[in-house]
Amino acid sequence: MANTKKTTLDITGMTCAACSNRIEKKLNKLDDVNAQVNLTTEKATVEYNPDQHDVQEFINTIQHLGYGVAVETVELDITGMTCAACSSRIEKVLNKMDGVQNATVNLTTEQAKVDYYPEETDADKLVTRIQKLGYDASIKDNNKDQTSRKAEALQHKLIKLIISAVLSLPLLMLMFVHLFNMHIPALFTNPWFQFILATPVQFIIGWQFYVGAYKNLRNGGANMDVLVAVGTSAAYFYSIYEMVRWLNGSTTQPHLYFETSAVLITLILFGKYLEARAKSQTTNALGELLSLQAKEARILKDGNEVMIPLNEVHVGDTLIVKPGEKIPVDGKIIKGMTAIDESMLTGESIPVEKNVDDTVIGSTMNKNGTITMTATKVGGDTALANIIKVVEEAQSSKAPIQRLADIISGYFVPIVVGIALLTFIVWITLVTPGTFEPALVASISVLVIACPCALGLATPTSIMVGTGRAAENGILFKGGEFVERTHQIDTIVLDKTGTITNGRPVVTDYHGDNQTLQLLATAEKDSEHPLAEAIVNYAKEKQLILTETTTFKAVPGHGIEATIDHHHILVGNRKLMADNDISLPKHISDDLTHYERDGKTAMLIAVNYSLTGIIAVADTVKDHAKDAIKQLHDMGIEVAMLTGDNKNTAQAIAKQVGIDTVIADILPEEKAAQIAKLQQQGKKVAMVGDGVNDAPALVKADIGIAIGTGTEVAIEAADITILGGDLMLIPKAIYASKATIRNIRQNLFWAFGYNIAGIPIAALGLLAPWVAGAAMALSSVSVVTNALRLKKMRLEPRRKDA
């Protein structure tokens, strides 16, 4: 190969030599390709002819075989974007770069998230490419105070606005002369006075628009800066032309439009300031989450307590937490007992009792006892850090509903410039033939009324505020896509154990004396069965002292048999009692049947071959489960329960909470198939679960909802995480989605409607340029302000909410 390039790809998913051989063979089948795949290093080295192939082709080939190519993700801060055309252009350019798998640019957060192949490109190249487009870019620094940076930028905008307003206000008086035929001092109408005021506004305050326009045009793009620069320049330089005519005596009453250019720039700066101020409020939820983090920790070193910064805590460190202090990091209690306020994580205001070996979560509040703990997760691995990461990703992601606005934004400015040019031609040739000024005014109005900003802000601002508000209530959406999909859900499938129920069996009924209970708990205390644990805990709550068993024997399918202090104990079902010739009184038999019908596990107890008690154990239904399911029904959503339990137990639980559809006796591997069956009926299905065996069903469902108290596998597989396990958050999540999508539609309707109506009105000459500029400035502000209404939304579902 005369013209060759070499690249190295990190491959994931290979398990043996057959994998590496398969990939190597497939790559080498491509023309002019020489590939070697190393299983040990998990790398593929590929030599190829760049005229025939590119790296993406090799990546696609590897992925088609079922393997992955390692991708790195970087977040970039971008400044200088003024409208949707800017963010769309940067996104388009990044996605065309070699080695970039996917790039999204968010105008609201002023950030880009880029997934790239490290063998082909790196973060510095991405930054350089953005800078070449005329914007400032840097790799996001998580330790940098973004709030103070934005506050400084906002202050800078305010100063420029004030200076521009002071210079423009005297010129504004001229507009009142035109509108209301007012008398004003001659100084205000003096061309030199107007020139002196308007020029610094145009070329010092407004220089940013020229710079932005130049950078965009140089790179083959166009944005809002182009519209503002062209529109205000037309007014300003026409005024210069008229002023020259006045100076050389060609006219005694020059038609000046200095006030138009200056007031336009001031109004646009005013709109941008209001927009930036409103946008800064959209990230409040994230700021509140960050403020929850502890700042320092008390570490035990050589027997002494030392306060250290939080970032110096390592896994395995021994920490001491006193009453009223925040738990610094995730960990496990090794000494002491206390109550922990976990409301920031679960929303539950009642403190949770914690003892030795219990886990504690960083940033929760220690209420009343000094504890010693071992750090198990620190830094970015803590529960709060993961919550913040999920919220950040959701707020910077794009919803599919945004695609139309993105497409239009890419063509918006050139179309508007074309309409403005056409307006000028029509006016000067047909409407007012040969008269320059009306044509100029109408075309300037078209240029300045058009607003690509409103289009670009319509979706991301709503997503930011909506996901932030949801996070404040313990609902974590993993992205805008899932916010949009959730509002379409018409069927919710709930796993039973750990989702509808607490997942921990407890004693619900006991008939017998304390001696029988003591013997029963002693017999069960060495068993690892969850039912045995429930019985032992029940006895401990009664403060009974457990002794030791002399003999113990499990009777498969029947129960247990034990000897304790010369007492013979039998615990089990009817069959066990019958086999030992122990008769059941009718009332005991009726109780047993009643418990079993309610889905409880009932056990008979006999001491020395005499029936002495009956105990029932069940996995109890969660608080508010019934209310949550009623709310879902009120919203017009069908609710089903999916469980591996037998039908009787499942029906009993379903009856308690008001679920009509029960899918029972399902093996874990069959859960995903049951979801698919519902989807084949045309239903949009959400699956709610908490265990490892729920993960495939969570992935298969249109929306997977994980209970935050569940396993990491389930949470990773889900699209939404409900913190704390309160089922009332499920209808709230759906309502948050519906409210956010409704808000986005309002924003898009306003953004599209404003431009569709405003541009023709301006072209007809019905709006003065300064009125058009004011309308443009306020259009994007109105979109952001409407999105901010979501901050106050009450997550209370409406009946049959559409």
Curated annotation (Swiss-Prot):
Name of the gene: copA
Catalytic activity: Cu(+)(in) + ATP + H2O = Cu(+)(out) + ADP + phosphate + H(+)
Induction and repression of expression: Induced by copper and, to some extent, by ferric and lead ions.
GO terms classed as biological process: copper ion homeostasis
Cellular component annotations (GO), alphabetically ordered: membrane; plasma membrane
Main location class: membrane
Lineage: Bacteria, Bacillati, Bacillota, Bacilli, Bacillales
Cellular location(s): Cell membrane
UniProt organism field: Staphylococcus aureus (strain NCTC 8325 / PS 47)
Domain HMA: residue ranges: 5-70, 72-138
One example GO MF annotation: P-type divalent copper transporter activity
Function: Involved in copper export. Can also probably export ferric and lead ions.
Transmembrane segment boundaries: 161-181, 192-212, 224-244, 256-276, 411-431, 438-458, 748-767, 771-790
Keyword terms of this UniProt record: ATP-binding, Cell membrane, Copper, Copper transport, Ion transport, Magnesium, Membrane, Metal-binding, Nucleotide-binding, Phosphoprotein, Repeat, Translocase, Transmembrane, Transmembrane helix, Transport
Protein name: Copper-exporting P-type ATPase
Membrane topology category: Multi-pass membrane protein
PANTHER family, sorted: ATP7, ISOFORM B, P-TYPE CU(+) TRANSPORTER
